[in-house]
Amino acid sequence: MTLLTAESRIEPGVWDEWVAKAIGSINSEVGARIYGGVSTVYEDLGETALRCAEALRLLSFHVLDGREVLTPRYGEEVMSERVLPAFDSTEMVQCLVAALFKQDREEVHRLVEGMFRFFRESWYLLPEAWNVYEELFALLRQRLRKSGMTGLDYALRGQPDPNIYNSYAGLETVVLEDMEELKRLIDQNGID
């Protein structure tokens, strides 16, 4: 959400309150969770694209604590306080390879759930979580090929649409689908 003012200046705090009331009213009316990325107030029409991009970027913060109104001030606070611990992709790959070769669906699910629990608890944004998964998937393919799966031909499909997969659970579903496909290919092709 953006606001272009023509004649009188509106303080950012007032704008944030208006948006919070509007979103709160919509949420209670429709009975659903709606999130609003709110840009700073601006006076120059030439800033419209920049402010829309700012509001869109802030929407990715909704996964952190379920806040409905995501303001630039909130985004700055989060980014200044947040320290992302590194995810140990190497250990995860070892565990996943073992579970995939054993065709242990429950263990694969447990590992993926643990990875996403780590992302949630560490306040990873969804694009950051996906980047870690892309790295992990590349290491996983490499490790499977070294283990004799030279015919493995499964590529990561690219980052899912953030408008559809806009939660940890959504991304976790995509990752579990990838793991199921790898498990199926291992079962089907065996080791060379």
Predicted region positions:
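Cytosolic nucleotide-utilizing catalytic cores of signal-transduction proteins
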Residues: 1-192
